[in-house]
């Protein structure tokens, strides 16, 4: 079986954040996960280990692979279920499995921002490049996936450079500010706390800082990085360990860390609400897995929003750019066809290689035979003639045998094929006497 492309995954279209956080891969787990995935196929009859890459973000977890194993689809879904200890019947309804051209089209759309919650957002492209880099370091990236991703990045650049897909997009950060303005009439009068110091927190800090909040604080596990971000926006840093004791000081809390467990629990928020005398707290949890226990959202005077909640506001901005979407989809469709042509060409490489190997083996055998004839004193012209006749007979033996064995439509197809190989071959009617 030829190498086949396959994408297995879940995203914000198919699964809620409660499930997405359970199948997310922390960065430090991706290389070991790729190793275990490849080991799944060691006992299978397919001769080649699969190529694989894992893309894990707030909105999606996807496994891209290239394999010649016919059972790859079911094996990949079963592996994802087993790895995360999620019952297969619970995970399966939310999983999509995209073969060949569908996998290519999906990769192009994801990198171009067409499949994002924030239409046209650029962060996903960097995340995909990081996924490819990690797969390369893990030794799980081969010819097929490497070519797929290089084409993917080129298509994303073309889409973003020739369409308005990223223009006037409502980012998650901007959506968070809009929601805060629904709770607090003036964000400028509020104290804002950011937990984390990654790209998403940086974007949120940019948008909230533009509102001129009363105070801006950054709490991060790495104090130096948190202080650097806070200084950039005229704020201050605070140790993450101080969060439980100081949570009541803040009106707005935005969190996005890489923690695999919640860092804000129900009890801590209950104490903060009590200390605030029930003044409202606006909380945004942009992390997957979530940073804030979901039960917090049930508390009176707490307004908790997740990435899925912000999606509704984001989609309002997406609707106005459908012309750009259509233009981008047209570009992608053309590039998908181009890539599939390359993939089809790759599928004949093993056949061509085998033909060369067979022909070379025949050549070497006949040359050795000719050398022996010359060594015993045979006439060189006779040796050359014998060599050429032997090569001719052996090289056309396969095609002529196939023609003799074929019947009906198969025979006609083979005859047409041979005419293509040997352009001056006569038609069957041309062999009759005239």
Curated annotation (Swiss-Prot):
Belongs to the glutamyl-tRNA reductase family. The active site is at 58 (nucleophile). Catalyzes the NADPH-dependent reduction of glutamyl-tRNA(Glu) to glutamate 1-semialdehyde (GSA). Its EC number is 1.2.1.70. Pfam families: GlutR_dimer, GlutR_N, Shikimate_DH. It comes from Burkholderia pseudomallei (strain 668). The lineage of its organism: Bacteria, Pseudomonadati, Pseudomonadota, Betaproteobacteria, Burkholderiales. It catalyses: (S)-4-amino-5-oxopentanoate + tRNA(Glu) + NADP(+) = L-glutamyl-tRNA(Glu) + NADPH + H(+). Signal peptide: none annotated. InterPro entries: 4pyrrol_synth_GluRdtase, 4pyrrol_synth_GluRdtase_dimer, 4pyrrol_synth_GluRdtase_N, GluRdtase_CS, GluRdtase_dimer_dom_sf, GluRdtase_N_sf, NAD(P)-bd_dom_sf, Shikm_DH/Glu-tRNA_Rdtase. The keyword Oxidoreductase applies. CDD domains: NAD_bind_Glutamyl_tRNA_reduct. During catalysis, the active site Cys acts as a nucleophile attacking the alpha-carbonyl group of tRNA-bound glutamate with the formation of a thioester intermediate between enzyme and glutamate, and the concomitant release of tRNA(Glu). The thioester intermediate is finally reduced by direct hydride transfer from NADPH, to form the product GSA. This is Glutamyl-tRNA reductase. Substrate binds at residues 57-60, 116, 121-123, 127. Homodimer. Pathway: Porphyrin-containing compound metabolism; protoporphyrin-IX biosynthesis; 5-aminolevulinate from L-glutamyl-tRNA(Glu): step 1/2. GO terms for molecular function: glutamyl-tRNA reductase activity; NADP binding. Keywords: NADP, Oxidoreductase, Porphyrin biosynthesis. The keyword Ribosomal protein does not apply.
């Amino acid at each position: 079986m030829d190498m086949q492309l396959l994408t297995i995954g879940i995203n914000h279209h198919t699964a809620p954040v409660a499930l997405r956080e359970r199948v997310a891969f922390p960065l430090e787990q991706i290389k070991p996960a790729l190793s275990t995935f490849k080991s799944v196929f060691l006992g299978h009859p397919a001769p080649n280990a699969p190529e694989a890459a894992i893309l894990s973000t707030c909105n999606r977890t996807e496994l891209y692979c290239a394999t010649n194993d016919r059972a790859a689809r079911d094996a990949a879904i079963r592996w994802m279920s087993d790895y995360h200890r999620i019952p297969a019947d619970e995970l399966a309804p939310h999983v999509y499995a995209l073969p060949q051209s569908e996998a290519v089209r999906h990769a192009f759309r994801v990198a171009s921002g067409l499949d994002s919650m924030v239409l046209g957002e650029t962060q996903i492209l960097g995340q995909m490049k990081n996924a490819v880099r990690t797969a390369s370091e893990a030794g799980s990236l081969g010819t097929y996936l490497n070519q797929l991703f290089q084409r993917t990045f080129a298509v994303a650049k073309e889409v973003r450079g020739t369409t308005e897909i990223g223009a006037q997009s409502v980012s998650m950060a901007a959506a968070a500010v809009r929601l805060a303005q629904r709770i607090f009439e003036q964000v400028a009068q509020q104290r804002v706390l950011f937990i984390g110091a990654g790209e998403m927190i940086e974007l949120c800090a940019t948008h909230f800082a533009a509102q001129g909040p009363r105070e801006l604080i950054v709490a991060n596990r790495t104090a130096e990085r948190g202080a650097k971000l806070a200084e950039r926006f005229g704020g201050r840093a605070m140790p993450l360990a101080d969060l439980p004791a100081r949570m009541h000081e803040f009106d707005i809390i935005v969190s996005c860390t890489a923690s695999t467990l919640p860092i804000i629990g129900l009890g801590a928020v209950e104490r903060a609400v009590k200390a605030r005398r029930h003044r409202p707290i606006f909380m945004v949890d942009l992390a997957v897995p979530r940073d804030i226990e979901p039960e917090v959202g049930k508390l009176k005077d707490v307004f908790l929003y997740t990435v899925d909640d912000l999606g509704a506001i984001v989609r309002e901005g997406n609707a106005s750019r459908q012309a750009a979407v259509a233009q981008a989809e047209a570009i992608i469709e053309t590039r998908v066809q181009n890539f599939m042509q390359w993939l089809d060409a790759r599928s004949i490489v093993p056949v061509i290689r085998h033909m060369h190997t067979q022909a070379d083996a025949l050549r070497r055998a006949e040359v050795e035979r000719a050398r022996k004839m010359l060594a015993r004193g045979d006439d060189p012209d006779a040796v050359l003639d014998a060599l050429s006749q032997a090569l001719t007979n052996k090289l056309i033996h396969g095609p002529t045998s196939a023609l003799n064995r074929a019947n009906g439509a198969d025979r006609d197809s083979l005859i047409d094929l041979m005419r293509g190989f040997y352009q001056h071959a006569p038609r069957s009617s041309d062999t009759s006497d005239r």
